[in-house]
Amino acid sequence: MRYTSHAVETLIDEFAKLPGIGRKTAQRLTMFILHEEKEKVESLAQALLDLKNKVSYCSLCQNVTDKEIDPCNICTSVKRDKRVVCVVEAPNDVLAFEKTNQYNGLYHVLHGVISPLDGVGPDDLKVKELIHRLSETDPETSIKEVILAINPTVEGETTVLYLSKLLKPLGVKVTRIARGIPIGTELEYIDDATLTRALEGRSEL
């Protein structure tokens, strides 16, 4: 079905471009917004603009942060163990670990995994930034352990293998979360208890 309104059709098309949103869902979202009060729609529009204008990436961990807060709140927290860094694929994975309230170290977000079929190599990820962090020499803040918490996919396994070979010669302990997580499952969809057990049961590579 095509709508007589160009504005309605345009918004449906834009929503349908989002991951996990089909055309029917895009239509429902558009109709919902159409019937919302103007002030609420303007608030949503402003939130979207703020997302692009005010959000950046932490210069240390590469996680999302407000532009005026860099390094991010996690990296600067005095309550965090700065000697342990958990390497994850995406910012959503940081949220998953934070929800468990069991991890007290820092993070490093790669923003992807090695995927030759998609033309994504190590240079396309935040690997150099991770290596730079390992050069810290202060005994109280220098990284002693790197936990590889990459999604258990084929691409994720390739990334883990690459990073473990890259990091071991640097004299840092390299571990990975336990394999109790099903292959092909993304960490952000794992329940807190399972993710906590995977973190606690991590093994050295």
UniProtKB/Swiss-Prot annotation:
Keywords: DNA damage, DNA recombination, DNA repair, Metal-binding, Zinc, Zinc-finger. Residues 83-182 form the Toprim domain. The keyword DNA repair applies. GO terms for molecular function: DNA binding; zinc ion binding. PROSITE patterns: TOPRIM (PS50880). One of its GO terms (biological process) is DNA recombination. Pfam families: RecR_C, RecR_HhH, Toprim_4. A zinc finger (C4-type) spans 58-75. May play a role in DNA repair. It seems to be involved in an RecBC-independent recombinational process of DNA repair. It may act with RecF and RecO. Belongs to the RecR family. PANTHER family: RECOMBINATION PROTEIN RECR (PTHR30446:SF0). This is Recombination protein RecR. The lineage of its organism: Bacteria, Pseudomonadati, Chlorobiota, Chlorobiia, Chlorobiales.
